[in-house]
A protein has these predicted regions:
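Alpha-helical transmembrane segments and their cytosolic interface
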Residues: 1-16, 104, 137-183
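Hydrophobic transmembrane alpha-helices
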Residues: 1-49, 53-54
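Short helix-perturbing small/polar motifs within transmembrane alpha-helices
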Residues: 7-21, 58, 79-127, 165
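Hydrophobic alpha-helical transmembrane segments of integral membrane proteins
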Residues: 19, 34, 38-39, 59-60, ...
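Interfacial aromatic-anchored transmembrane helix boundaries in multi-pass membrane proteins
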Residues: 21-36, 61-96, 130, 140
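Membrane-interfacial segments
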Residues: 26-34, 69, 73, 96, ...
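Alpha-helical transmembrane segments of multi-pass integral membrane proteins
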Residues: 31, 43, 77-85, 110, ...
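Hydrophobic transmembrane alpha-helices of multi-pass small-molecule transporters
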Residues: 41-44, 63, 67, 86-90, ...
């Protein structure tokens, strides 16, 4: 393993640990704790800072591991659907951030695209899981889960994540280097 690979592995492990612990902090606010989507923050940051493979891996593992270790979220359907959603968050944020120019507005665009793609995948996963378990997942449940109940988390992510990404870039902590065109 190269030094860069070891650093990415270390950063990814840190983001995974934060994803496991952060829900305990927001869970202390019963009214909006889960609506803040605390596990999403370190997964998105991992994608931005470490690249798409690490963001995908942390996103896929975090909800499943948290479910097994702490019983929350429930494994089926929540943790499984979240695993697909967060894997897309981490992969999209890492991939788009590497190929697009590094400008502040691009960070917001990457974040919004990643969030939309992740929510769509979450909805698809929930529909498939509902079919497998014999339950139902309606359009109203999708809108409620992906948009209405998620508004506090969406706002938090749009405010916090770009600021953290820009600060970490300035501090030289990003390991997700821009892809340059072949000459």
């Amino acid at each position: 393993m190269t030094s860069l690979q070891i650093r990415k592995l270390t950063y990814a492990a840190l983001y995974l640990a934060i994803a496991l612990v952060l829900p305990f902090v927001t869970g202390q606010i019963p009214e909006i704790g889960s609506m803040l989507s605390p596990m999403h923050i370190p997964v998105l940051l991992c994608g931005f800072m470490c690249g798409w493979p690490w963001g995908l891996a942390v996103g896929l593992i975090a909800p499943l591991l948290r479910s097994v270790l702490f019983g929350m979220p429930a494994l089926i359907p929540s943790a499984v659907a979240m695993a697909f959603e967060l894997a897309v968050y981490g992969a999209m944020s890492g991939l788009l951030y590497a190929i697009l120019p590094r400008k502040p507005w691009i960070t917001y665009a990457v974040l919004v695209i990643s969030m939309i793609a992740g929510r769509i995948v979450w909805g698809i996963a929930r529909v498939i899981l509902a079919g497998m378990t014999g339950s139902s997942f309606t359009w109203a449940l999708f809108i409620s889960g992906a948009v209405t109940n998620a508004i506090p988390g969406i706002i938090l992510h749009l405010v916090l994540i770009p600021v953290l990404v820009m600060a970490m870039e300035r501090a030289g902590l990003s390991l997700n280097k821009p892809k340059t065109a072949a000459r």
